[in-house]
Regions:
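A nucleotide- and high-energy phosphate-metabolite-utilizing enzyme signature
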Residues: 2-218
Length: 218
C-alpha cells in the first residue's frame, strides 16, 4: 500500500499551507470561543455564511404580495428551509476542505443566529407589526457559540415583567417556525426575576445562564 508522506494532499490529509493556516491560532484558543473566531473571519471577508440583507429583501417580497396570511407563512417557511439547507451545505463543504471543527461549530451557531434574527424581524415588521417585548437569548452550548450538526438549539425568552397575550403569540410564532424547519429546540420563557430565582434553585439553569448570548428582541 502506498505510504502517504507528511503534508501530502489527499482526501484525508491537509496540505502544508492548510496546516500552517489552521495552526496559526492555538487549538485551545480556537475552541475557547469559536463564535468570535468565525465573527473575526467574517469581518476579514474570509467566510460568508448567510446574506442577511438578501434574506430581509426576500422576506419583504413575500409580505408585500397579495397572499393570505397562511400562504405568506408557508412562503416564509419555504424560504427559511432553503437558507438553512444552503447554509449547512456550505458549512459541510468548508469542513471537508479545511478540517476545522472550531470554525464549523462557530459558523453553524451564527447561521442559526441569522436565521432566527430574520424570523424575528419578519414577525416584528409584518406578522405582528410591533417590536418584540422579550429578549431572545441563546443558552447552553449554543450560547457558547458551539453548535454541532445535530445539536439542540437552546433558547431563553426573557419576558417583560408584565407580559401580554400578544407576547406569548409572538414567542409561539418563532417556536413553531423553528419546529417546522425540523430544528430540535429546547426553550424556556421567564422574566428576569424568575431567571434569578431559577438559577438559585437549579445549578444546570445557573450554568446555562452564565453562557447566554443575545440573538434578537428587546
Amino acid at each position: 500500500m502506498r505510504q502517504v508522506r507528511p503534508f501530502e494532499e489527499n482526501s484525508l490529509s491537509l496540505s502544508r499551507i492548510q496546516m500552517e493556516k489552521v495552526s496559526a491560532v492555538p487549538l485551545w484558543q480556537r475552541w475557547l470561543s469559536p463564535h468570535e473566531l468565525v465573527r473575526d473571519k467574517e469581518r476579514a471577508g474570509e467566510i460568508h455564511i448567510l446574506d442577511t440583507q438578501l434574506f430581509a429583501e426576500e422576506i419583504s417580497t413575500i409580505y408585500s404580495s397579495k397572499q393570505t396570511k397562511s400562504d405568506q407563512r408557508a412562503a416564509l417557511l419555504s424560504l427559511s428551509k432553503v437558507k438553512l439547507s444552503e447554509g449547512r451545505k456550505a458549512l459541510e463543504v468548508g469542513l471537508m476542505r479545511d478540517r476545522d471543527g472550531a470554525v464549523y461549530v462557530g459558523a453553524h451557531a451564527i447561521l442559526i443566529d441569522q436565521l432566527i434574527g430574520g424570523l424575528v424581524a419578519a414577525a416584528e415588521n409584518y406578522v405582528f407589526a410591533t417590536k418584540a417585548r422579550f429578549a431572545l437569548m441563546a443558552v447552553g452550548g449554543y450560547g457558547r457559540g458551539e453548535l454541532a450538526p445535530l445539536s439542540d438549539i437552546d433558547l431563553l425568552f426573557v419576558m417583560p415583567q408584565r407580559h401580554k397575550k400578544s407576547d406569548a403569540e409572538f414567542v409561539e410564532f418563532i417556536l413553531y417556525m423553528l419546529w417546522d424547519l425540523g430544528l430540535v429546540v429546547g426553550h424556556a420563557s421567564r422574566t428576569v426575576h424568575q431567571n434569578i430565582a431559577a438559577a438559585g434553585e437549579d445549578l444546570t439553569i445557573c450554568t446555562s445562564l452564565l453562557e447566554m448570548r443575545s440573538i434578537a428582541g428587546a
